[in-house]
Amino acid sequence: MKRRIGLLIALSCVACGCSAQGSDPSPRARTQPASVETGTLAGADYRIDLPADWNHGLVVWFHGYAVTPVQLPARDPIAPQLRQFLDRGYAVAQSAYSATGWAVEQGVADAERLRAHFGEKHGKPRETFAAGMSMGGTLTVMSLESAPDTYAGGLSLCGAIERSDSLLQRDFALLAAFDYYFPGVLGPLVPVPANYLPTQASEKQIASALAAKPDAAESLLRIWGVGDVATLGSVVAFNYYEVGELQRRTHGNPFNNADLIYTGNKDAFALNAGVKRYRAEAAAAAYIARWYTPSGKLLRPLLALHDTGDPLVPATAAFDYALAVQRAGHADNFVQQFVNKEGHCVFTPQEIGRAFDELVAWVHDNKRPVSGPLPPPER
């Protein structure tokens, strides 16, 4: 149960950052507090934290997928993950976006509006970095590819940076397989009921079904390819909500498993013969492809950091983006690193700080990080 609840907590942290924790201070912590500005721009709440000893650099932070609206109250201390940027002298600007869910379309515009507002109020930063977690990694890549004259570099943390149709179709394929093995546990897949929420109760119901049929659960896990049965219930619960939200967003069904051959499980023949097949509606599928399909035209350094045991956004999926930049001739501007952990976006604040230091050194001194494990702290 703790691991299932942990994934829900991780999703919350990805969306808005967790509350500051005194047990995990930055090694570079400032003694002077930052000034905080909050407000609303075109329906999107925002927050700007400006350190007292500002170095005139800016980090535009992109939060991840949010089921409920993100709150950015000025009275709360900045999340320890983001405090790493402040403690290095950078201002942090974060938008709550004007929509929840797969708000890639809105997030790009909302963050750009906030960045422009920051410049009007505080002057043009000497350099601007993009950074984000999960879906925020998607927005980080989009920002770097579309505005290389604006951003000096980017940091993608557990980012969903492969093509969205590839990522999201895989999520749907898992649900269709789950429905085959565990009929009646979920509601309809097309359309997903609008009132469904990925709560602890829904997770518990799915987890109980998995526990009752361990062979079927193992087959499902092999299809998914990452994590374990303890986290699979959380993944199914979240994916079911995500699929419904995207159906409502696109005013149709963007998902297709009609031509998919499931592999990896022992009973693949029976599954492929018996699973219910669905075809996507063209306009709905086109929306997902538009938001987003990376071009690979990466003209600024991008460091991606992933945890090897991420059950929600598999670490292997980031290689799709590595191939995109390779095809476009910009492979020198992309580096993938990892930490050997299980969970979605379970980096410590210090790990985020070290990754950001690597990115800054890459931009400032042309010290390209080495692909592989995140280097340990210097002693």
Regions found by a protein language model. Give the residues of each.
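N-terminal cap/lid segment of alpha/beta-hydrolase-fold proteins
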Residues: D24-W54, G274-R277
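Gly/Ser-rich "nucleophile elbow"/oxyanion-hole loop immediately N-terminal to the catalytic nucleophile
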Residues: D53-W54, R113-S134, T150
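Short beta-strand element of the alpha/beta-hydrolase
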Residues: H56-Y65
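Primarily recognizes the serine-hydrolase "nucleophile elbow" in alpha/beta-hydrolase
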Residues: E127-F182
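Accessory cap/linker subdomain of secreted extracellular hydrolases
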Residues: A160-T293
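Short beta-strand/loop motif that positions the catalytic acidic residue
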Residues: A304-H306
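Conserved alpha/beta-hydrolase "acid-adjacent" motif
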Residues: P311-A317
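Histidine-bearing beta->alpha loop at or near hydrolase active sites
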Residues: N333-T348, V360
